[in-house]
């Protein structure tokens, strides 16, 4: 389900290795790369959704990672109309996301892109922390900027510097309405078709 403003509740995952490089996944059968992300199901907390998506998309279990931080508020992006499925136009606007910063405590070979029946990625690599800002699709860039900047202060000291900070970038950011209003997390509802596929 969507919230009252037409945004789908979602989680995003920034997964670090011991060199503070980030996991970057290639969407299956495309040339598009992105961070792991996915919808929050009815009754799930953002943390529960994060662990589920981490296993479905990357094949990792909770014991393979350590949570370093999460964004305080929802970060939102609107999806351009031509990427929205026709039947969802008029009520679906985009995604609102809580982002998690995780550190891999296991090994690279603990990852398995085919841990579920419908894999999201068919390849992956480690990237320097700020590189995704240069290559992510335009309408997600502001949210990536805000998430990476907010989470950067929780990086282990070895890589604690904000290269490539940009001025004038904006993303939709709101207080956590569901927490403040006492509402339960909402059912995830696909409405978006991006170059990476439905998310």
Curated annotation (Swiss-Prot):
Residues 6-149 form the Nudix hydrolase domain. One of its GO terms (molecular function) is pyrophosphatase activity. The keyword Hydrolase applies. A motif (Nudix box) lies at residues 38-59. Pfam families: NUDIX. Gene3D superfamilies: Nucleoside Triphosphate Pyrophosphohydrolase. Transmembrane segments: none annotated. Its EC number is 3.6.1.-. Its cofactor is a divalent metal cation. It comes from the Bacteria. Residues 166-199 are annotated as: Disordered. Accelerates the degradation of transcripts by removing pyrophosphate from the 5'-end of triphosphorylated RNA, leading to a more labile monophosphorylated state that can stimulate subsequent ribonuclease cleavage. NCBIfam families: PRK00714.1-2, PRK00714.1-4, PRK00714.1-5. This is RNA pyrophosphohydrolase. It comes from Methylibium petroleiphilum (strain ATCC BAA-1232 / LMG 22953 / PM1). The lineage of its organism: Bacteria, Pseudomonadati, Pseudomonadota, Betaproteobacteria, Burkholderiales. The gene is rppH.
């Amino acid at each position: 389900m969507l919230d009252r403003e037409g945004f789908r509740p979602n989680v995003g995952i920034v997964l670090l290795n011991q060199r503070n490089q980030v996991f970057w996944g290639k969407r299956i059968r495309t040339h598009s790369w992105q961070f792991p992300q996915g919808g929050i199901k009815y009754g799930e907390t953002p943390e529960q959704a994060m662990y589920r998506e981490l296993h479905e998309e990357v094949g990792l279990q909770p014991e393979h990672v350590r949570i370093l931080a999460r964004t305080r508020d929802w970060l939102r992006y609107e999806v351009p109309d031509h990427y929205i499925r026709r039947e969802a136009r008029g009520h679906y606007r985009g995604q609102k996301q809580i982002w998690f910063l995780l550190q891999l405590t296991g090994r690279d070979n603990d990852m398995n892109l085919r841990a579920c029946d419908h894999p999201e990625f068919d390849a992956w690599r480690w990237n320097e922390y700020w590189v995704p800002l240069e290559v992510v699709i335009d309408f997600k860039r502001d949210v990536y900027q805000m998430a990476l900047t907010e989470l950067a202060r929780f990086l282990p000291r070895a890589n604690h510097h904000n290269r490539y900070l940009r001025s004038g970038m904006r993303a939709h950011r709101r207080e956590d309405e569901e927490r403040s209003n006492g509402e339960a997390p909402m059912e995830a509802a696909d409405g978006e078709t991006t170059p990476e596929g439905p998310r």
